[in-house]
């Protein structure tokens, strides 16, 4: 009985709640059908008390039986046409959806998301489509919460473009859609965005730490918060530190330790919170501001940028997407290890030289670091 009730409820919802021109025709016929059945009905109702008599007389319709019959069969015809049209339309739609590939890219590192894989979220949202997924898991390169083997982890990310190319070549460009979600160290999230910058259909999700689930970015809202810029001058004219405080403040003492006598540009949000990143518009706008700052540094003659970024995964990914691999200068995105004697021990180096792959760049051992170690 429960199964029968479920089938009836789902059928009613499909016929009377789903929006389509075909079902509009079906509903028009369904609304007229009972009216035609009532065309010849007549009845009398009386309510009698000691003091009054109330009666209701409903006479049969004066509409000729021929017109009632025409209306009856016409309503059935509308329902039949609408239902047949909707079935054909649904079959065609399902065939078109089956051609489409939704490629889910999940990256695991800082938090174990295996209990709520990204592919499950994608399957619920994109029902009927061909779902393909890949998981880049670098937890075997981590020890005690730090990245102990960055070169090994980097190899897994460099295969990402090949994985996408394999799947994209099997369908038309408009039928290929990427859904990205990760929780990995900032340099790898930035690199992932950089590698996928040429992909037009990318939906970016982030991990909601409060709900322990994947969450989509809001495409509409924007608090219009802007970066506040500060400058620390130094003698170097080729290399510069670009420090971005998005979700929390960067470690300025660690920057001084790892990059001494190097000029610094700091871009800071006043409201630095772990949940200040859910606006897609905000991320895109601030990514544009970041790139404009890089272009200004390039015009000033700096050709080696040391990027220190404190942000959520989706923000780092968005910033990486915005970084033009052909026209912007060499950049290294550094990993922060708070308890390490070298707080910024390594970074992922990205160059604009043709055919040059991103690589791991170790922090140079200076006199200040020697004293700290």
Please place each PLM-identified region on the residue numbering.
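N-terminal topogenic membrane-targeting module
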Residues: 58-78, 84-174, 185-186
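Long, charge-dense
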Residues: 198-228, 270-279, 330-356
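N-terminal alpha-helical membrane-insertion module
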Residues: 1-97
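C-terminal functional regions that serve as terminal interaction/effector modules
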Residues: 298-300, 313-373
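Gly/Ser/Thr-rich loops at beta-strand to alpha-helix junctions
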Residues: 108-112, 174-191, 245-250, 306-317
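Redox- and metal-dependent alpha/beta enzyme cores, enriched for Fe-S-associated oxidoreductases
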Residues: 223-292
């Amino acid at each position: 009985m429960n199964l029968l009730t479920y089938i009836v409820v789902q059928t009613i919802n499909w016929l009377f709640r789903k929006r389509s021109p075909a079902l509009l025709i079906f509903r028009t016929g369904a609304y007229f059908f009972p009216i035609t059945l009532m065309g010849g009905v007549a009845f009398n109702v009386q309510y009698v008390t000691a003091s009054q008599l109330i009666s209701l007389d409903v006479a049969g319709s004066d509409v000729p039986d021929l017109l009632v019959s025409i209306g009856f069969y016409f309503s059935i015809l509308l329902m039949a046409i609408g239902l047949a049209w909707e079935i054909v339309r649904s079959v065609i739609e399902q065939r078109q959806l089956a051609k489409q590939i939704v490629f889910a890219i999940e990256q695991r590192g800082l938090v174990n998301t295996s209990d709520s894989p990204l592919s499950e979220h994608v399957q619920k949202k994109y029902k009927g489509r061909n779902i393909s997924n890949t998981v880049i898991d670098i937890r075997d390169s981590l020890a005690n919460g730090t990245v102990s083997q960055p070169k090994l982890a980097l190899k897994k990310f460099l295969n990402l473009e090949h994985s996408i190319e394999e799947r994209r070549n099997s369908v038309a460009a408009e039928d290929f859609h990427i859904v990205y979600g990760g929780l990995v160290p900032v340099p790898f999230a930035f690199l992932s965005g950089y590698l996928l910058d040429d992909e037009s259909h990318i939906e970016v999700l982030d991990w909601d730490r409060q709900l322990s689930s994947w969450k989509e970015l809001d495409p509409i809202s924007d608090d219009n918060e802007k970066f506040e810029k500060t400058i620390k001058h130094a003698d170097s004219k080729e290399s510069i530190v670009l420090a971005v405080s998005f979700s929390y403040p960067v470690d300025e003492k660690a920057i001084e330790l790892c990059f001494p006598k190097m000029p610094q540009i700091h871009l800071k949000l006043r409201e630095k919170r772990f949940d200040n990143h859910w606006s897609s518009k905000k991320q895109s706008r601030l990514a544009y501001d970041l790139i404009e700052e890089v272009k200004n540094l390039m015009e000033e003659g700096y050709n080696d940028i040391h990027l220190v970024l404190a942000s959520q995964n989706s923000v780092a990914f968005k910033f990486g997407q915005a970084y033009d691999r052909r026209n912007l200068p060499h950049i290294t995105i550094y990993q922060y290890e708070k308890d390490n004697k070298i707080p910024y021990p390594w970074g992922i180096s990205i160059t604009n030289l043709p055919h040059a792959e991103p690589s791991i760049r170790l922090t140079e051992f200076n006199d200040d670091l020697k004293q700290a170690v």
